[in-house]
Amino acid sequence: MTNSNLRTENHFDYVKITLASPERVMEWGQRTLPNGQVVGEVTKPETINYRTLKPEMDGLFCEKIFGPSKDWECHCGKYKRVRHRGIVCERCGVEVTESRVRRHRMGFIKLAAPVSHVWYLKGIPSYVAILLDMPLRDVEQIVYFNCYVVLDPGDHKDLKYKQLLTEDEWLEIEDEIYAEESEIENEPVVGIGAEALKQLLEDLSLEEVAQQLREDINGSKGQKRAKLIKRLRVIDNFIATGARPDWMVLDVIPVIPPDLRPMVQLDGGRFATSDLNDLYRRVINRNNRLARLQEILAPEIIVRNEKRMLQEAVDALIDNGRRGRTVVGANNRPLKSLSDIIEGKQGRFRQNLLGKRVDYSGRSVIVVGPKLKMHQCGLPKEMAIELFQPFVIHRLIRQNIVNNIKAAKKLIQRADDEVMQVLQEVIDGHPIMLNRAPTLHRLGIQAFEPKLVDGRAIQLHPLVCPAFNADFDGDQMAVHVPLAIEAQTEARMLMLASNNILSPATGEPIITPSQDMVLGSYYLTALQPDATQPEFGDRSATFAGLDDVIHAFDDTRIGLHDWVWVRFNGEVEDDDELQEPLKSETLSDGTRIEQWTYRRDRFDEEGALISRYVLTTVGRVVMNHTIIDAVASA
């Protein structure tokens, strides 16, 4: 591909998520413009100018950092149109390019003081606490400026490495150190805040700690051993990924592209903005104030308070509400942080990446389809014509019914008989997939042969309900059409409902009749205790075949539980305990009749069976006839 405009495909095997180093974060946001100017750092909390409605320079929507807000137009308007592609305006410094770059170009905020990443500090488990082998409460005391931590005990005999000291305790020790009679030469070093945490993490030699832990694990057991293994696992993962523990303390914060946190003007001149902009603004304001305080050498207590506020602002940006008070906006609504956008059912992954809308799919309520075979489903005509429209259009043109796509679509809208006939031809042998959420195992999505039905509900065979965990009280199912021949073949061979009789989890049948099917089968074959058994030859209760019984039942000449004599020449298994027939007689033509409790057989002179009549109920005839039909058509 020589043309640079053509997109090249990047083939990759996997996506790896690791900790980002400060240099990597700056790489994401920092760019060198064609004129050599380096841009990327967001230094101002402003978003847009409310007079000109244009983004403020070096602000959260800066066109120099993120790209122009209008295609092929710089900020000041000197350069317009595509012919100036790639030029950097000498007046405003904006590169002339497409506005869609604002969807992927990032910026960054350089922090005046390090801050701890709230995920690794307050997550479960707390990786910072595990790595430092300190209680989470102690680590929090350090980060949020409540306690000092000893970074180097020096010559002081009462201090230990990583020991916590309150403000008063440290003041007492300072008095000792700087007293005239003090013998301490090597002064102890203490720290507070995320800077101290970063120092502690930098001091960790992962390989040495891992080696020591392995030795300790061999000589320990119980709770202590479990704790050591937990710490070793975290350290081994850091070593394997090449990440450094001090990267869990942030020096640089990435600013996501402006089109992913938009600001839109409403009717009446007011603006609606993403919550992220407010959270970023808090961080920038506090960061700038801290930088100014450090510049003018403000008292330590004021600087420390500003550092704590910066830490809380970054916490709220990354995960609002994880620690401390939740930051709220107008009408006391908690602001949506980066974590809130990513996590949960409505988050970016589950809602937008995994839960994308797909073409050639539909959704409707399911109802029972008792006349369907197990591998079939009833698909409403209205849905089928929409789902299979490309196939129908192709066939209509191929059969010279219409000349072009437009004419075919008009014909389809009228839903003529001709179109329905073509649709029937298209769906014959074209499986569709039915899915019921939640798809908890592979049988939650299965393939079926569609049968066109009237109405707007999908018809489903009752036997496949346990696999989908479906019932008919208003459940909905999604329909998907496999397009490629390979997909259709796979659906037919592997996913057809009649090929998925056993549960993949237990190996036991998942296609089992239940509830109304069992009750119906019982009711159909039940014997009525007070029903009288007719004599053989009674014209109203003797039939020449199973079909005659069913016709008589359909005409309401006999009831479901009435006893009937029906001719049936097949094998009969009965529980007749009599060794001898109730009655046996030989007729004048040499044929012999044997009367049993539930059957009457007639044999010729040589003992061959001529005819057999069975005494049974109409319901049992219906059941038997249904099974014979099902087996014959399988």
Swiss-Prot record:
Q: Which family does it belong to?
A: Belongs to the RNA polymerase beta' chain family. RpoC1 subfamily.
Subunit record text: In cyanobacteria the RNAP catalytic core is composed of 2 alpha, 1 beta, 1 beta', 1 gamma and 1 omega subunit. When a sigma factor is associated with the core the holoenzyme is formed, which can initiate transcription.
> Which pairs are disulfide-linked?
none
* EC number annotated for this UniProt entry: 2.7.7.6
Catalyzed reaction equations: RNA(n) + a ribonucleoside 5'-triphosphate = RNA(n+1) + diphosphate
What Pfam family does this protein match (any one)? RNA_pol_Rpb1_2
Q: What is one process in the GO biological process aspect for this record?
A: DNA-templated transcription
Q: Which InterPro entries match?
A: DNA-dir_RpoC1_gamma, DNA-dir_RpoC_beta_prime, RNA_pol_asu, RNA_pol_N, RNA_pol_Rpb1_1, RNA_pol_Rpb1_3, RNA_pol_Rpb1_3_sf, RNA_pol_Rpb1_clamp_domain
Q: What is the name of this protein?
A: DNA-directed RNA polymerase subunit gamma
Q: Which residues bind Zn(2+)?
A: 74, 76, 89, 92
> What would be the name of the gene that encodes this protein?
rpoC1
Residues annotated for Mg(2+) binding in this entry: 471, 473, 475
Q: List required co-factors.
A: Mg(2+); Zn(2+)
* UniProt keyword terms in alphabetical order: DNA-directed RNA polymerase, Magnesium, Metal-binding, Nucleotidyltransferase, Transcription, Transferase, Zinc
Q: How is the cofactor bound?
A: Binds 1 Mg(2+) ion per subunit.
Q: Give the function comment from the record.
A: DNA-dependent RNA polymerase catalyzes the transcription of DNA into RNA using the four ribonucleoside triphosphates as substrates.
